[in-house]
């Protein structure tokens, strides 16, 4: 009989997807002990620690390992889930495996292995030491195989049940309402496309981080989308845009799921994953270039009933997909518990 004990090593940040996964595990009756990775390293917070992370050794690794070993000894978990894998080098994982050979090591990430954060040779060499890799990026599977990952589990990103709620806005929340919205951090490609849309008089609002650095977007930028404001924004727009991170080869993102779940019309970049998730022009709308995007935005702003029809079908499709974090975690652990490694 499996114990239901899990140690979860990741960023314990309010509102994060990590928090949602941990909440889901607890709802599924797992006992979860959280080790907050932010205690050991946060990006852009410490130059000295950043140098250690780049090198793959130093006091931060000893401190992390000491805490993890202490918690394993105290908590006696069946699984150790690690999100921030670059805080463990080969020596760290080997020591854990030697001392606790029955413990299952899981590397779980919703980010691409191709991001700069993970493109560290010492970290990539640790992938073969994990019993399981859980990834939300199908395009990364071959990379994990290249580094001799033992067992790879693919899962779609998850969404929160709050995505399906309808939100009435107060007078003070009117800035959250929009015709067209984009939620996401500044990026060069998406900024160029949004600039093109603005110059074509598209009534767009932008929420996210780092847009305030650029004077051109000042009038259209409304700050980050925090806590429940995020759900309110998506539930009170006509059209929400789904841009992808081309640097890491994204083929869908969490927002690809959250936008239709919230009842907005998703207009996103055309990819195979998007077309697997939604029927084109019936549950979501896709575009190949900025001119096509502009054309489709204009069309669906003018054709209100057609837009509502597709948005409603997209929302129903998301309910059928059942891609809440709780559902996804349940599926992941079904695979974990039915695979010996």
Sequence positions of predicted segments:
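Charged, glycine-enriched surface loops/patches
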Residues: 95-107, 129, 294
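Conserved acidic donor-binding segment of nucleotide-sugar-dependent glycosyltransferases
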Residues: 253, 284-290, 299-305
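C-terminal alpha-helical cap of glycosyltransferases
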Residues: 325-341
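N-terminal Rossmann-like NAD(P) cofactor-binding module of classical short-chain dehydrogenase/reductase
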Residues: 81
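A short, well-ordered alpha-helix in the C-terminal region of glycosyltransferases
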Residues: 306-320
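Short hydrophobic patches on amphipathic alpha-helices
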Residues: 72-73, 97, 127, 234, ...
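A short, histidine- and acid-enriched strand-loop-helix "catalytic/donor-clamping" loop
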Residues: 103-118
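Nucleotide-sugar donor-binding catalytic core of glycosyltransferases
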Residues: 2-54, 59-67, 75, 84-91, ...
